[in-house]
Regions:
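Nucleic-acid-interacting cores, centered on viral/eukaryotic replication and modification enzymes
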Residues: 1-247
């Protein structure tokens, strides 16, 4: 994303605060094929048992944890909000589950934020500034702080974003190197396990661990250049432990 500012916005427990009645109605209009099933699922109130409370608490808002369609219902429930913000053309926005972000110049991003704060509660979406981040790519931190004055937000030059990293090149490289260091430690731990359980360690490696850096290499430009310590750990420690001999 080539935006000069990127605002990453989080809202706490959004799945629990979603306006259920509005979400079910939106599903009736936008996802009619599943609307009857969702209505039957949520026509009653799930009981929540809280330690120290004699009577169960009835879940009247949001989606129920464990519901296979909870994520899909939430997505349809906030879709009108997403479309409303998009139609006003403030800036480029990205939504993933209950996390929202917007990229662009500082003025339009602030207008997008004001609209989100104003319209979000109507859909059960309650933004929380203290858990939000403003990524400033060109080093103008003071300008960004002035634009978002009054909001307890974090201002950085680089940060994680949707599993990758975004921001100033040097800062992104530092974050990436820290991530690679943790991967090297994980590979070394798997190498120790591979001496006794080589097949299990190999399955953990190909099914889980390598997927992490495989994704980062796809979404972070130049990530492969920082992977040399990881390549060395795999070649010198993990593979010899799996095969029981030097490679």
């Amino acid at each position: 994303m080539r935006a000069r500012r990127l605002l990453c916005w989080w809202t706490p427990n959004a799945f629990n605060s979603l306006d259920r009645q509005a979400a079910l109605w939106n599903c009736r209009i936008l996802w009619s094929r599943a609307s009857l099933f969702l209505f039957n699922t949520y026509r009653g109130y799930a009981r929540i048992f809280v330690k120290g409370v004699a009577q169960p608490v009835l879940s009247r808002e949001g989606t129920t944890q464990g519901d296979p369609l909870a994520m899909l219902m939430y997505a349809v429930g906030v879709l009108p909000l997403v479309r409303k913000l998009k139609e006003r053309g403030f800036c480029t926005q990205t939504w993933y589950a209950d996390d929202a972000s917007a990229g662009g110049k500082v003025g339009p991003v602030r207008e997008w934020l004001n609209a989100l704060i104003q319209d979000g509660p109507m859909y059960g979406y309650y933004p929380e500034p203290s858990k939000s981040i403003v990524i400033v790519k060109d080093g103008k931190l003071e300008e960004a702080r002035a634009a978002f004055a009054g909001l307890d937000m974090e201002f950085v030059e680089a940060s994680r974003f949707l599993g990758g990293f975004l921001g100033k090149e040097d800062a992104v490289r530092h974050l990436l190197e820290e991530k690679v260091r943790k991967w090297v430690e994980a590979v070394e731990d798997l190498a120790e396990a591979a001496e006794v359980y080589p097949q299990d360690a190999y399955v953990c490696f190909i099914k889980s661990l390598q997927c992490e850096w495989g994704y980062v290499q796809r979404v972070v430009e130049g990530a492969a250049e920082a992977m040399d310590p990881l390549d060395k750990a795999i070649q010198d420690k993990f593979l010899p432990a799996v095969f029981g001999r030097e490679m």
